[in-house]
Design a protein with these regions (language model features):
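Transmembrane-helix signature of polytopic, membrane-embedded enzymes
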Residues: 25-57
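Transmembrane catalytic cores of multi-pass membrane glycosyltransferases
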Residues: 109-217
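Short acidic/glycine- and proline-prone juxtamembrane loop motifs at membrane-interface regions
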Residues: 62-70
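Short hydrophobic alpha-helices at membrane interfaces in multi-pass membrane enzymes
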Residues: 84-102, 149-153, 225-232
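Short hydrophobic/aromatic helix or loop-helix immediately within or flanking a transmembrane segment
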Residues: 1-11
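Membrane-interface transmembrane helices that cradle and orient dolichyl/undecaprenyl
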Residues: 78-94, 213-221
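Membrane-interface alpha helices of multi-pass inner-membrane proteins
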Residues: 55-59, 93-113, 157-161, 231-238
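Specific aromatic-rich, kink-prone transmembrane helix
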Residues: 29, 70-87, 119-131
Length: 270
């Protein structure tokens, strides 16, 4: 509804230009979080050629006047805010997440459930950190009561924010109803799972993902459990439907790519 209204006011040409601007903003946010703009912190050439360039090329090719690419900005914003909250203990920006969620659910309600997925996963990993310290290279930060309180409040607010829309509570179940629509799943190709037998899918989508996973395996650094859990959330979603590829690219670049560059991830240096 919002997109139709904007098209009627501005015309499709300006909406397409706006979506391309959103693409550039999201790429900037991703690359900044990955550390690409840091002095003397350049990614390995192979990572550029085999991961970042193919992924952002596919993302750019998908950039048209669709609400999914507004949602991409929201996913990037959640990555930036949650990463800084977890690694740098910056709590106050987390209270922007419910506000972002209100915009998200009213612009593209079909993906707004990602808001409470992301916050909920960070909350669960934080609780797990009370009982678990490290599992190999996977690091669980031991939370204090203040952090648990903040993340729980933000989670409740984000869930509540999903109710602020013309359809109320029904928007909480709408995405799941979509996923059960057999006709839509059969006739809309982007809802299908990625097909590794397709050469382009293999080279441009699956191979960069596998290299992202290899990044985690090869790094000598401790890997934050929350960042890893968010990455695997989007892997599962992508394997369920190719429509989540754009969001996987964003999450992989923001949260996992820094490990490929051997960038210091300690507090105050993100």
């Amino acid at each position: 509804g919002v997109l139709i209204y904007l098209v009627s006011c501005m015309g499709m040409r300006w909406i397409v230009i706006g979506c391309h601007l959103l693409y550039l903003i999201v790429v900037y946010l991703c690359c900044k979080q990955a550390g690409l703009f840091r002095k003397n912190q350049n990614p390995p050439a192979l990572y550029w050629m085999l991961v970042l360039l193919p992924q952002f090329a596919v993302y750019a090719n998908m950039t048209v006047a669709r609400p999914q690419y507004v949602s991409a900005l929201f996913v990037a914003a959640f990555c930036v805010i949650l990463r800084n909250a977890v690694l740098n203990k910056k709590y106050k920006p987390m209270y922007l997440l419910p506000i972002i969620t209100v915009l998200w659910v009213n612009i593209h309600g079909g993906t707004a459930m990602l808001s409470y997925y992301m916050v909920g996963i960070v909350m669960l990993i934080s609780v797990a950190g009370i009982f678990v310290k490290n599992i190999g290279k996977i690091s669980f930060d031991k939370p204090d009561g203040q952090w648990i309180g903040h993340i729980f409040i933000v989670f409740v607010l984000v869930v509540a924010a999903n109710l602020i829309n013309p359809y109320g509570w029904h928007m909480l179940i709408y995405p799941y109803e979509n996923m059960q629509d057999s006709m839509m799943l059969a006739y809309i190709s982007e809802w299908a799972s990625p097909d590794a037998k397709n050469v382009l899918t293999l080279v441009l989508e699956i191979l960069p993902l596998l290299l992202g996973i290899f990044t985690i395996v090869q790094t000598d650094k401790q890997i934050n459990a929350s960042m890893l859990a968010l990455f695997f959330l989007y892997i599962v979603l992508f394997l369920r439907s190719e429509r989540f590829l754009t969001y996987l690219v964003i999450v992989q670049t923001c949260l996992i790519a820094p490990y490929a560059f051997q960038i210091e991830l300690s507090p105050g240096k993100s």
